[in-house]
């Protein structure tokens, strides 16, 4: 398996994503935002940071970068896509995931470890966790408040698209939502950082299982 790690001007978690992929015993390669093809890749990782300085709003300018059309096609083909933090914001901006990310209720940047509850463990991203398992991922964002209408939330619930919820909501996200998937189950977005949770020496290795689940799920279908 080979992951594409996208790089935009202002990305700052691309190395963490790259290392998380390598730790899962697969290949990874950085892909510049000006590229227009994802040929040769089996998965896409969209890292956190402040793409294009977060001008207009987080992820807005990245959403019209050349690489995003390739990401849409990649997702349409059923291949796995993970967007974390700014990557989640980009996925909502390009319409691969529902909802939007707003400023934190506190209007402050939040940076700390957060406990999360695994709401749905029957996905390609969470199937190595137990249902209702508590995991710990770092968060680092100023615009992490996940917003959706009640109707959208009801659809997310009905389709089991909510995969992670905050134990102690740090940003005002609707019904504590921390991470979701698309209806097809191959696109995942979350504000917390699993790629920063892969080394026990840094306080938590809860994120290892998420990347390994992605790899295992791909291998089950393709090897």
From Swiss-Prot:
SUPFAM superfamilies: Class I glutamine amidotransferase-like
Glutamine amidotransferase type-1 domain segment(s): 2-223
Chemical reaction(s) catalysed: N(2)-formyl-N(1)-(5-phospho-beta-D-ribosyl)glycinamide + L-glutamine + ATP + H2O = 2-formamido-N(1)-(5-O-phospho-beta-D-ribosyl)acetamidine + L-glutamate + ADP + phosphate + H(+); L-glutamine + H2O = L-glutamate + NH4(+)
Record has Cytoplasm as a keyword: yes
GO CC entries: cytoplasm
GO molecular function terms attached to this record: ATP binding; glutaminase activity; phosphoribosylformylglycinamidine synthase activity
Pathway(s) it belongs to: Purine metabolism; IMP biosynthesis via de novo pathway; 5-amino-1-(5-phospho-D-ribosyl)imidazole from N(2)-formyl-N(1)-(5-phospho-D-ribosyl)glycinamide: step 1/2
PROSITE patterns assigned: GATASE_TYPE_1
Cell compartment(s), UniProt: Cytoplasm
Classification via InterPro entries: Class_I_gatase-like (IPR029062), PRibForGlyAmidine_synth_PurQ (IPR010075)
One Gene Ontology term from the biological process aspect of the record: 'de novo' IMP biosynthetic process
Alphabetic keyword roster: ATP-binding, Cytoplasm, Glutamine amidotransferase, Hydrolase, Ligase, Nucleotide-binding, Purine biosynthesis
EC number(s) reported in the record: 6.3.5.3, 3.5.1.2
Active-site residue numbers: 85 (nucleophile), 193, 195
Keyword field contains Iron-sulfur: no
HAMAP family: PurQ
Function: Part of the phosphoribosylformylglycinamidine synthase complex involved in the purines biosynthetic pathway. Catalyzes the ATP-dependent conversion of formylglycinamide ribonucleotide (FGAR) and glutamine to yield formylglycinamidine ribonucleotide (FGAM) and glutamate. The FGAM synthase complex is composed of three subunits. PurQ produces an ammonia molecule by converting glutamine to glutamate. PurL transfers the ammonia molecule to FGAR to form FGAM in an ATP-dependent manner.
Record note on quaternary structure: Part of the FGAM synthase complex composed of 1 PurL, 1 PurQ and 2 PurS subunits.
Protein's name in the database: Phosphoribosylformylglycinamidine synthase subunit PurQ
Provenance organism: Staphylococcus saprophyticus subsp. saprophyticus (strain ATCC 15305 / DSM 20229 / NCIMB 8711 / NCTC 7292 / S-41)
Source taxonomy: Bacteria, Bacillati, Bacillota, Bacilli, Bacillales
Gene field: purQ
């Amino acid at each position: 398996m080979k992951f594409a790690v996208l790089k935009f001007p202002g990305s700052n978690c691309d190395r963490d994503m790259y290392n998380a992929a390598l730790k899962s015993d697969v290949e990874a390669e950085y892909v510049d935002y000006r590229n227009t093809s994802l040929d040769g890749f089996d998965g896409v990782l969209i890292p956190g940071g402040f793409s294009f300085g977060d001008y207009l709003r987080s992820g807005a300018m990245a959403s019209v970068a050349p690489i995003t059309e390739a990401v849409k096609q990649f997702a349409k083909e059923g291949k796995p896509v993970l967007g974390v933090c700014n990557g989640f914001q980009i996925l909502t901006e390009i319409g691969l995931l529902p909802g939007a990310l707003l400023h934190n209720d506190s209007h402050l940047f939040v940076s700390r470890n957060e406990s999360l509850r695994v709401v749905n463990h029957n996905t390609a991203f969470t199937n190595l966790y137990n249902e209702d398992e508590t995991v710990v991922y770092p968060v680092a964002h100023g615009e992490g408040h996940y917003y959706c209408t009640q109707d959208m939330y009801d659809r997310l619930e009905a389709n089991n698209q909510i995969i992670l919820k905050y134990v102690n909501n740090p940003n005002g996200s609707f019904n504590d939502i921390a991470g979701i998937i698309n209806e097809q189950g191959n696109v995942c977005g979350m504000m917390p950082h699993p790629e920063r949770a892969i080394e026990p020496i840094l306080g938590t290795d809860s994120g290892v299982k998420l990347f390994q689940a992605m790899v295992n799920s791909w291998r089950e279908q393709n090897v």
